[in-house]
């Protein structure tokens, strides 16, 4: 059945209340056969994904957060099942999906100039970009996955599974919501509490840059 699910209020939604957070959708949609799942980082991605989804077979889920979108300085058109490299690194790479990738970019800008950290916007949780993941698996010793949802079954789990299936052995650190319900609060307060703001992400990167 070809249906396009536009999942609004994905991730932490802030003042809408504790029952409105969209934290579990990636984890429960990923096991469904023939399901495609994507998340835009910037406004242009969302436009491309909605256009692309109309021509796909099977169900497609496009997840995006509450609030205003970010416009891209330079936009790479979205391709089905393909991620992009936003920044190349040396020993450590951050893999993100969706709008939280903009927070990762802010975090990276706060690091010392000598930090050589890669950043990849995966764009698609399912299917995953095999060629990009092979490149990442060969190149990096440490990976940090960042997602605005439950880490159990989400991007972090998917990356761990893929690396194990293809005999790569990087250390994988998963940032996201750790097996819990999240209370009411502003997005800034909650992301800070979960270490998913720029400060928290930068701290995790710094602690693992030379491990």
Feature-to-residue mapping (PLM):
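Thiamine diphosphate
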Residues: 6-7, 12-22, 55-211
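Internal gly/pro-rich beta-alpha loop/helix module
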Residues: 15-33, 39, 43-54
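A glycine-rich helix N-cap at a beta->alpha junction
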Residues: 1-9, 28
